[in-house]
């Protein structure tokens, strides 16, 4: 709690929100949001960034900062109550003036980010326009040098070993940090570099085994697919008996991080079970679906993403949608995937916010979602030194959507479509995007919009770079 010098708790204190709804609607929402706002690298930026550096055969190194937040600067006047362990050593009512940001202080992450940004600017780096967690060397006459930041976890990427040594020395002069050498792990991922093949392998087997042990599934019977093709996951009727909440939400949270980083094969099943995390909305069938995913994870814990490669790395994009496949709401599922070379670096599986009237309409919706991601990916690759030589190609398997975008005419069946969903059509008219047809069998985005059988799931996972890396290990 922040106090005034007189000890009045109401002078500087900002109450902690009790729920997310209160956090974004209360009168204090802007204050605590700004205080806590520290840039963190999105996983899409991380995978794209690592993929390009592997293909260029750059060196990847990382430092380790000690007491990170204490190295920031505090610009506000903040007073603290005397900790209970010191009450006997100081007079009653003693207040302490805080000199440095400490862990638990709302603005500590922001202060550390500002301090680090100032340090990197002094070393000749500037923020990327596409991602505020990516820093680029400002002197274009020198060899490229990139720094990716996630709070206090940094990744250096460059082929200039002399500059790498100088940057490390500059950070050690200004902050308390040690050099960890070549990158081996990052944010819970195990990283294996193959300089000969110019590939980087990302696995999360250690975290998977922790999750399986936590819920007692380390010795469970294996499952070939995470979700059966004829599943019946839907909202339960209101008069049905309620199952106890238990660790349902913990299941979803643990698997969500795995899916975000390396296991895109869990995207669609997780998007289904995550709709029923509210107590009283999930039933036995939803519990069984989560348990099946853990059994599937147990049998595929050795799988990982293989980024990079010596071949020509081209950004490919696929978009797909399944019309009205939600049994309870009749809403549709959309998804996209962006691959660099033979490995996916960005993916999404989501449900439409409202009911869509036709497969053409849901195709337009999915195309707009993919077009938004395409614009950002183009900016990110441009900052990474990869300028597109020709308009990127978006592959879809919806012929009606392709015809509507190419003919550019309005019909009575399509005049109600919201204009904001015609982004893909607008980019095509400007020459910034090409739309191409691909058969459903070759559309890798199917894995993000529907439950697939074992053979199709394995085929699409292989096409997206999710391969068996480690032997299947059962951890006691």
Where are these regions (language model features)?
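Polymerase palm active-site segment centered on the conserved acidic dipeptide of motif C
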Residues: 123-130, 155-208, 212-215, 220, ...
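Conserved pre-motif C helix in the palm subdomain of viral-like polymerases
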Residues: 53-75, 93-134, 142-168, 242-268, ...
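Mobile genetic element proteins and their domesticated derivatives, centered on retroelements
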Residues: 20, 36, 43, 64, ...
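Catalytic palm subdomain of template-directed nucleic-acid polymerases
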Residues: 69-82, 103-107, 137-175, 192-203, ...
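C-terminal reverse transcriptase regions that engage the nucleic-acid substrate
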Residues: 180-302, 439, 447-449
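Structured nucleic-acid-interacting core domains from mobile-element enzymes and related host factors
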Residues: 40, 50-57, 295-321, 386-388
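RNase H-like nuclease module associated with reverse transcription
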Residues: 276, 313-314, 350-476
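Chromodomain-type histone methyl-lysine reader module
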Residues: 1-118, 122-129, 134, 471-476
């Amino acid at each position: 709690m922040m106090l005034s010098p007189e000890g009045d708790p109401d002078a500087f204190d900002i109450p902690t929100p009790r729920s997310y709804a209160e956090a974004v609607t209360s009168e204090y929402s802007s204050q605590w949001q700004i205080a806590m706002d520290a840039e963190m690298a999105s996983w899409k930026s991380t995978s794209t960034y690592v993929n390009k550096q592997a293909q260029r055969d750059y060196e990847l190194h990382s430092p380790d900062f000690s007491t990170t937040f204490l190295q920031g600067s505090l610009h506000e006047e903040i007073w603290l109550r005397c900790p209970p362990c010191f009450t006997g050593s100081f007079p009653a009512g003693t207040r302490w003036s805080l000199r440095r940001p400490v862990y638990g202080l709302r603005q500590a992450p922001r202060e550390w980010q500002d301090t680090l940004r100032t340090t990197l600017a002094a070393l000749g780096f500037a923020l990327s326009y596409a991602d505020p967690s990516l820093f680029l060397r400002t002197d274009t006459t020198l060899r490229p040098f990139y720094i990716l930041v996630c709070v206090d976890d940094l990744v250096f990427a460059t082929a200039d070993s002399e500059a790498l040594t100088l940057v490390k020395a500059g950070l050690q002069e200004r902050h308390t940090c040690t050099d960890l050498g070549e990158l081996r792990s990052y944010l819970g991922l195990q990283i294996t570099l193959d300089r000969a093949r110019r590939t980087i392998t990302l696995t999360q087997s250690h975290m998977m085994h922790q999750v399986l042990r936590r819920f007692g599934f380390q010795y469970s019977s294996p499952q070939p697919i995470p979700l059966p093709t004829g599943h019946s996951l839907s909202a339960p009727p209101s008069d049905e008996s309620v199952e106890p909440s238990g660790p349902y939400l913990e299941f979803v949270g643990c698997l969500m991080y795995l899916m975000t980083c390396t296991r895109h094969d869990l995207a669609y099943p997780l998007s289904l079970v995550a709709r029923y995390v509210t107590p009283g909305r999930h039933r036995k069938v939803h519990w069984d679906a989560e348990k099946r995913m853990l059994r599937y994870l147990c049998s595929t814990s050795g799988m990982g993403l293989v980024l990079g490669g010596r071949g020509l790395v081209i950004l490919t994009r696929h978009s797909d949608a399944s019309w009205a496949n939600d049994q309870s709401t009749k809403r549709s599922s959309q998804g996209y995937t962006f691959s660099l070379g033979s490995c996916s670096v960005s993916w999404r599986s989501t449900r439409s916010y409202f009911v869509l009237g036709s497969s053409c309409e849901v195709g337009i919706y999915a195309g707009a979602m993919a077009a938004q991601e395409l614009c950002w990916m183009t900016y990110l690759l441009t900052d990474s030194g990869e300028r597109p030589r020709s308009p990127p190609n978006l592959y879809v398997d919806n012929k009606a959507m392709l015809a509507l975008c190419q003919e550019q005419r309005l019909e009575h069946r399509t005049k109600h479509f919201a204009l904001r969903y015609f982004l893909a059509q607008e980019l095509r008219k400007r020459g910034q995007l090409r739309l191409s047809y691909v058969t459903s069998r070759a559309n890798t985005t199917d894995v993000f919009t529907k439950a697939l059988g074992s053979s199709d799931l394995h085929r699409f996972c292989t096409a997206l770079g999710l391969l068996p890396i480690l032997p299947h290990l059962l951890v006691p």
